[in-house]
Amino acid sequence: MQNDPIGLMDSGVGGLTVLKEVQRLLPTENTVFLGDQARLPYGPRSVAEVTMFTKQIAQFLRQQAGIKALVIACNTATAAALTTMQQTLPIPVIGVIAPGAQAAVQTTRNHRIGVIATAGTVKSDQYRRDILAAAPNSQIFSVACPEMVTLAEQNDLTTTHARSVVAANLASLMDKKIDTLVMGCTHFPLLRSAIQHAVGSQVTLVDPGLATAEQTAAILKTHGLLNPATTRGTAQFFTTGETAHFDTLASQWLDQQPMPAKHVSIAQLTTPMEVN
């Protein structure tokens, strides 16, 4: 089971930012990633629907790849489905919100923390709860930024248009005197330059991906699941969207030239499968 891959899932390609951190921290681990681009965005969807999608993807990754752990590399899906998945799957399940909240608490100096995320993540209030649980004197300012997800999926990251959209989305944070901003959607680290430009150098950006990779490593170690191999692990990719578009983004964002993604139809995800 140590050689089995770590599964990662996201509503689109944003979760590749988490995969990149996992590969950097755990280079010998095998991984398999599924981006559900055909059903993007998850943000406006109901908790029940996002939970159903997460269950379908987890079932697919277990059946197709025999994953030893699941990283929900999507803040919206983490907020909606993490507890359910942890209660129902016989493997470790890691989300991105708790690690991101903890990183924000460790980073802030004035305890004024901004959170940018999808509407679903903001509505869940999970970042606020997790931050306040660790630092009750914190003030949290959350903003839903769905247009920024679209920018990332379209690979529009550094243009004047991208900077304009990001600045408009973050305008309500400008008078809040935050010193820390959580990029509470895995797409947003791809827009780091535009985000930093909008909020200024005095604000520290927190990418939950690194903290999530660190938590994944710790959990695998606790369960005796770390891969003892000494060679670089393999990486498989699946998408419910267009494979050519996915491959272009993956090759641009990851440190290595990834193998081509395989297409998965929604029918494949919604058909019941036998999983041991």
From Swiss-Prot:
It comes from Levilactobacillus brevis (strain ATCC 367 / BCRC 12310 / CIP 105137 / JCM 1170 / LMG 11437 / NCIMB 947 / NCTC 947) (Lactobacillus brevis). The active site is at C74, C185. Belongs to the aspartate/glutamate racemases family. NCBIfam families: glut_race. It comes from the Bacteria. GO terms for molecular function: glutamate racemase activity. This is Glutamate racemase. It catalyses: L-glutamate = D-glutamate. Keywords: Cell shape, Cell wall biogenesis/degradation, Isomerase, Peptidoglycan synthesis. Pathway: Cell wall biogenesis; peptidoglycan biosynthesis. Pfam families: Asp_Glu_race. Its EC number is 5.1.1.3. It is an enzyme of class 5 (isomerase). InterPro entries: Asp/Glu/hydantoin_racemase (IPR015942), Asp/Glu_race (IPR001920), Asp/Glu_racemase_AS_1 (IPR018187), Asp/Glu_racemase_AS_2 (IPR033134), Glu_race (IPR004391). Provides the (R)-glutamate required for cell wall biosynthesis. Gene3D superfamilies: 3.40.50.1860. GO terms for biological process: cell wall organization; peptidoglycan biosynthetic process; regulation of cell shape. Substrate binds at D10, S11, Y42, G43, N75, T76, T186, H187.
